[in-house]
Amino acid sequence: MPEETQVHVVRHGEVHNPTGILYGRLPGFHLSATGAAQAAAVADALADRDIVAVIASPLQRAQETAAPIAARHDLAVETDPDLIESANFFXGRRVGPGDGAWRDPRVWWQLRNPFTPSWGEPYVDIAARMTTAVDKARVRGAGHEVVCVSHQLPVWTLRLYLTGKRLWHDPRRRDCALASVTSLIYDGDRLVDVVYSQPAAL
């Protein structure tokens, strides 16, 4: 009889980013005080779950989000590079409306194709590595629950892929808030449900 396994894919908490840059994979970006509180709220929400492993992206903000979750279950945080943030040409720049990056003609070529996208890691590659990460976690925690801490675009791309939706999308419409939990519920190796929650929401 197939076992039920749950993989809880958590987005990291709020990051201390006073200059408002797109930090991507850059080192040194840690959780803000709010982000630490969000991570603690997720740890509280998952405290009574049957969690046997906590696995995180190698980036600091993901490791810091994973730490209180792992501590609640007397586990060490494990690291999986497949959970890392997506690569992005604009990492290290301000890219909001009216900011310099968009007004620089030298970068316009990077914006030519929103479907791949041309400015970063292809969606299909993100989906492939995130699926690999989740499959490893599911096998590792068969019959139990596992937490994987990652980043907004990888988590959202994974969800689109697993639910059979197109991968290109409007970033403003991602249903993946800070410190949110996307729970993947498996019957054996078959995905039977996806449940989204925001335990850290105010």
UniProtKB/Swiss-Prot annotation:
Gene3D superfamilies: Phosphoglycerate mutase-like (3.40.50.1240). InterPro entries: His_Pase_superF_clade-1, His_PPase_superfam, PGM_Phosphatase. One of its GO terms (molecular function) is phosphatase activity. GO terms for cellular component: cytoplasm. It comes from the Bacteria. Keywords: Isopeptide bond, Ubl conjugation. The keyword Ubl conjugation applies. There is a cross-link at residue 136 (Isoglutamyl lysine isopeptide (Lys-Gln) (interchain with Q-Cter in protein Pup)). This is Uncharacterized protein MT0547. It comes from Mycobacterium tuberculosis (strain CDC 1551 / Oshkosh).
